């Protein structure tokens, strides 16, 4: 089943398009990684998929329904987002932050019931941070906050999960745990779209890689072709030899 369809979409701001004529689709249980330099438009594309940034042209559909026709509650039940950072202005506990992921299923003036707490705690356990449940959000490290944001998104039980550089603040062990979690979500039928600066992460989990170029053009294909040193070198402004040297994975060798 096709989960996400993007048809001739141009995204950005009035008079300043960032990406033009983007078209691709993702099926249920697939993982797609967005690769591109800083400022290339990866986050802008995700904000448009979420309905936070109106399209300049084209359309985006989730399960064959245009996002423009979905209510905010229906959109929140269909798609969740893990942003790069969240500084939280209030003294919420980690569990309270994760429970916010259950908002699409709770009445406006209702309180989370026991089953909602079980769902939130289960996501904290999945990511190995159940011990942080009662911690104040303001006391967390950057990596701990990132894991809690992932738990909050998973608590939404979305069909489509968007992750914006989710490993950027994680130590090596938590990166491994994150990749294992993404594989498990894929096996359970969730569709994942992840922006990353780690080609090895894309190689480890992605079915499809989308290259976001500096000129606003987008190309996509399997990791075996999109993650070659020559392609990555052009994307990040370095040489193929530098790619091979720094990544050191057999896939990237000549």
Which residues does each predicted region cover?
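The feature captures the beta-strand-to-loop junction immediately N-terminal to the Walker
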Residues: 35-37
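Catalytic Walker B motif of ABC-type/P-loop ATPase nucleotide-binding domains
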Residues: 161-165
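Helix-to-loop junction immediately C-terminal to a conserved catalytic motif
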Residues: 50
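Conserved ABC transporter NBD signature motif
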Residues: 58-66, 75
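Conserved catalytic motifs of ABC-family nucleotide-binding domains
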Residues: 157
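H-loop (His-switch) and adjacent beta-strand-loop-beta switch element
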Residues: 209-223
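Conserved ABC ATPase signature
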Residues: 136-140, 144
């Amino acid at each position: 089943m096709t989960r996400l369809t993007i048809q001739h979409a141009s995204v950005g701001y009035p008079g300043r398009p960032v990406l033009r004529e983007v078209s691709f689709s993702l099926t249920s249980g697939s993982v797609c990684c967005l690769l591109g330099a800083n400022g290339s438009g990866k986050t802008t594309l995700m904000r448009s998929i979420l309905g936070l940034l109106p399209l300049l042209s084209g359309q985006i559909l989730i399960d064959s329904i245009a996002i423009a026709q979905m209510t905010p509650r229906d959109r929140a039940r269909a798609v969740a987002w893990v942003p790069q950072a969240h500084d939280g202005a209030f003294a919420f506990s980690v569990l309270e932050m994760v429970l916010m992921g259950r908002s699409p299923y709770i009445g406006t003036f209702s309180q989370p019931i026991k089953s909602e707490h079980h769902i939130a705690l289960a996501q904290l356990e999945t990511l190995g941070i159940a011990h942080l449940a009662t911690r104040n959000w303001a006391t967390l490290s950057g990596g701990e906050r990132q894991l809690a944001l992932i738990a909050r998104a998973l608590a939404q039980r979305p069909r489509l999960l968007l992750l914006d550089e989710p490993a950027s603040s994680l130590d090596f062990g938590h990166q491994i745990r994150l990749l294992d979690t993404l594989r498990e979500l894929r096996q359970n039928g969730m569709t994942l779209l992840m922006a990353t600066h780690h080609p090895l992460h894309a190689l480890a989990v992605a079915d499809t890689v989308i290259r976001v170029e500096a000129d606003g053009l987008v190309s996509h294909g399997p990791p075996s072709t999109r993650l070659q040193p020559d392609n990555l070198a052009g994307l990040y402004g370095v040489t193929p030899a530098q790619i091979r040297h720094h990544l050191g994975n057999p896939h990237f060798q000549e």
